[in-house]
Amino acid sequence: MEFEAEHEGLTASWVAPAPQGGKGAEGRAGVADEAGHGKTEAECAEDGEKCGDAEMSALDRVQRDHGDKHTESTSRKRIEAKYMDLLVEAERENKNLRKKYNIILDVSTKILVFGTCIMFATGTLIGKGTKIQVPVCNSTNLALAFLAGFLTRHV
């Protein structure tokens, strides 16, 4: 079965996996093992736990719980699970991009502030030693640079 979902202009399509094994526990055991969690459903049941729920995707959990059933509600659950997996993946990617952006922004702000301080110190030394004034390096521009750095970081 082929499915398609759309959310905020993004479209995703996929093909539902073929049934795994027989009905009931045998089918679910094969799915749990193929998902790469190391234990079959029976082994997890012996330990009194659901097989790898924390690391399983929503689609894997639906497949484990419903096996090879092909009813309308199971198909709907598979579609919802795939959609949730896509949203989780998008959120994870968003967090990674946000981290990279914050690192770049933090470094650029530090370069701006420290560079302005160095320019101010250099301009002051040049101005005192040789009577040459460097117009870029005065206290007004230093204050503006600090303000710009602060606004860039916090807005």
From Swiss-Prot:
Organismal lineage: Viruses, Duplodnaviria, Heunggongvirae, Peploviricota, Herviviricetes
Region described as Disordered: 1-50
Gene that encodes the chain: MDV008
Record's compositionally biased regions (Basic and acidic residues): 34-50
Disulfide bonds, paired cysteine numbers: none
Keyword annotations: Coiled coil
Transmembrane segments: none
Organism expressing this protein natively: Gallid herpesvirus 2 (strain Chicken/Md5/ATCC VR-987) (GaHV-2)
Coiled coil (UniProt feature): 76-107
Superkingdom as given in the UniProt entry: Viruses
Descriptive protein name: Phosphoprotein pp24
